[in-house]
From Swiss-Prot:
Record-given protein name: S-adenosylmethionine:tRNA ribosyltransferase-isomerase
Record Gene3D superfamilies: QueA-like (3.40.1780.10)
UniProtKB keywords: Cytoplasm, Queuosine biosynthesis, S-adenosyl-L-methionine, Transferase
Highest taxon in the source lineage: Bacteria
NCBIfam families: PRK00147.1, queA
Cellular compartments per GO CC: cytoplasm
Subunit field text: Monomer.
Family from the record: Belongs to the QueA family.
Organism per entry: Salmonella typhi
Amino acid sequence: MRVTDFSFELPESLIAHYPQPERSRCRLLSLEGPTGALTHGTFTDLLDKLNPGDLLVFNNTRVIPARLFGRKASGGKIEVLVERMLDDKRILAHIRASKAPKPGTELLLGDDESIHATMTARHGALFEVEFNDPRPVLDILNAIGHMPLPPYIDRPDEDADRELYQTVYSEKPGAVAAPTAGLHFDEPLLAALREKGVEMAFVTLHVGAGTFQPVRVDTIEDHIMHSEYAEVPQEVVDAVLAAKARGNRVIAVGTTSVRSLESAAQAAKSDLIEPFFGDTQIFIYPGYQYKVIDALITNFHLPESTLIMLVSAFAGYQHTMNAYKTAVEQKYRFFSYGDAMFITCNPQAISERP
């Protein structure tokens, strides 16, 4: 399969730069997997689409203020984007500079350059940085970091983004991008879903900056997926198995929840799914046999991205590309701060190719 098979025309005007004033009032395009039928509505229509006993699986990662500005002690300006916190003192990061820093380079970070750090090692495209500060890394980031808005949101981050670019149930700091399907859930909608008898469970996948990296090969089978840390604890496994046993659906909120659940299923030795704690490089594209999820809530993704490939593997290539064409025609808002889709599984998708 070629990467260009997953291309589509997207007017710049449809890229959302700010979220809707009310989280759950975004538009919702529903795609019926088996038939390809499309229905237009709003996000709160989920209340009618979900049944008592269905299981929603959320990603409770919390976005960290991962973008830092400063300079090398020798003078050159730098921009640091944290990829992963290694411990209380060290990070792995992307560094943008006119000249890449060498091990031992001192970095002065923050508006007043009061935070001192040292680049200690290089690991491929990533730099290991150690802070020379008594505070833990997370406190430093909260003090001087900027929210790492995606590259297609062409504006500086604002104070409001610290909450808007966070799910209301975010709990575990570590992501450098939000699990954006979850941004549409507010407390009243969550309460209404609970009241209806919809079950909820939480995985953790710390979304890395690699999620925004373009696919740089022509043939998708040649693509090497970036690595991200995921946790699928025992209580999630129990909830999934219980939902399946009673004939209910497992509904992933976002592609990160999909990748967490399917990673846990791939690694399982005997059961459908078992607890999983570790890095995952799972790459889902047409031909993949889904093991766990029955429905998916997700935003609209970039052309030629691994995420539109994941959706195509679930709903079928033709149904997915037709839905995206319709979304553009109907002026849905795209990407992180945009509108959402509710998709049910297409059992024929596994045998369909572009």
